[in-house]
């Protein structure tokens, strides 16, 4: 891990091929203001005070050349993101201006920041706990409004405060028990039943957190949905209708889609990656064969398969063959997935036709009737997908916060340690045995919030951040 007396610099805005309106270069550290003063020319008598914005020019101190017209934002310690002196150059957008300003900052004595180092400094300086720091990364990566709201809840302490209270209760119980070990004759005996009740209450609180883990993972990472079926059943039309775009080429010619086309959607707060695949059939065309093979691989990697059928033709032998292939490969790879049958081209049927009017010679399976051409039934498709997800006990609804995978693993350890404490109490073991697992629970909670954490854990967490955050 780097030394944190250094002054660090990074581009804090996204670097994209398209030019942005503003690009920001951020400095943090003891030399941030001095470096800024060596590079920034502020006309007139503008005061260099905290939380003031200065107008002026960035100059190369060696050549005196003007690099950019910019605004300078000063945030002096401790009233800053990192609780160090922080300076931001607000430059014109585009790659060249911000890169030149960053190079000048480094030449003046700053070093390039590591990924997540600004937030790491905020954590080390006590502005954020570890769950709040993780929430920063989750907010930046959020793919839906729901994911952003959950990340913001973590950032504002909805995770940190109750977890700290659970840890404090563990430490208080430890103090009570260890006092009896040290001063056996001077203190009244403990009430094992009362201690056990407190432990059970802690377990209930931990279980409430653990119950959010699966839903949190779903909201953060989303679902991968593969649209599969034989050629010309309307798979690409379904993708276009669902995404309200023309991502996929649509023609009457079988085999038009030769490669996988992706689209990103949000349904009920859940990010969904939709994969439109090539029509699955036997073919002599080498390029189409590759597309068909990729379709099969995409189906196996998906969380949900939409098997599209031409409702005007009904269930055909080709549809059955595709269904059988999917079932066989899933069994071989032990990767069970949800399958939803989509009866497309309802516009070619009578308006009174319902799903039950179209016989499907397979086990009962969720089925939706729709028309990609007229975009009728898309809402019912989304409802069916949400129903499948919720049927597995996972929903994005009514979720105020959610723990991530790291936090869930540590809380599982806490729950197990508390179980061991209850077992020790029930077995009437000496008090020393109670303290062993209470210490373990408190340590796991400390690792979770950052109150007891190793350098390797911090490195692992913050390496996943973007540079400049």
UniProtKB/Swiss-Prot annotation:
Required cofactor names: K(+)
Entry binding sites for (6S)-5-formyl-5,6,7,8-tetrahydrofolate: 26, 88, 127, 469
Cofactor note: Binds 1 potassium ion per subunit.
Positions bound to GTP: 232-237, 251-257, 276-279, 344-347
InterPro entries in alphabetical order: G_TrmE (IPR031168), GTP-bd (IPR006073), GTP-bd_TrmE_N (IPR018948), GTPase_MnmE (IPR004520), MnmE_dom2 (IPR027368), MnmE_helical (IPR025867), P-loop_NTPase (IPR027417), Small_GTP-bd (IPR005225)
GO cellular component: cytosol
Alphabetized UniProt keyword annotations: Cytoplasm, GTP-binding, Hydrolase, Magnesium, Metal-binding, Nucleotide-binding, Potassium, tRNA processing
Uppermost EC category: hydrolase
Stored CDD domains: trmE, TrmE_N
Subcellular location: Cytoplasm
EC number per UniProt: 3.6.-.-
Positions that bind Mg(2+): 236, 257
A Pfam family it matches: MMR_HSR1
Domain (TrmE-type G) ranges: 222-390
Transmembrane segments: none
UniProt key word Protease: no
Binding site for K(+): 232, 251, 253, 256
The keyword Plastid belongs to this UniProt entry's keyword annotation: no
SUPFAM superfamilies noted in UniProt: P-loop containing nucleoside triphosphate hydrolases
GO molecular function, one term: GTP binding
BP GO terms, sorted: tRNA methylation; tRNA wobble uridine modification
Record's subunit section: Homodimer. Heterotetramer of two MnmE and two MnmG subunits.
Function per UniProt: Exhibits a very high intrinsic GTPase hydrolysis rate. Involved in the addition of a carboxymethylaminomethyl (cmnm) group at the wobble position (U34) of certain tRNAs, forming tRNA-cmnm(5)s(2)U34.
Family designation: Belongs to the TRAFAC class TrmE-Era-EngA-EngB-Septin-like GTPase superfamily. TrmE GTPase family.
PANTHER family the record matches: TRNA MODIFICATION GTPASE GTPBP3 (PTHR42714), TRNA MODIFICATION GTPASE GTPBP3, MITOCHONDRIAL (PTHR42714:SF2)
The protein's name in its UniProt record: tRNA modification GTPase MnmE
Species the sequence originates in: Thermosynechococcus vestitus (strain NIES-2133 / IAM M-273 / BP-1)
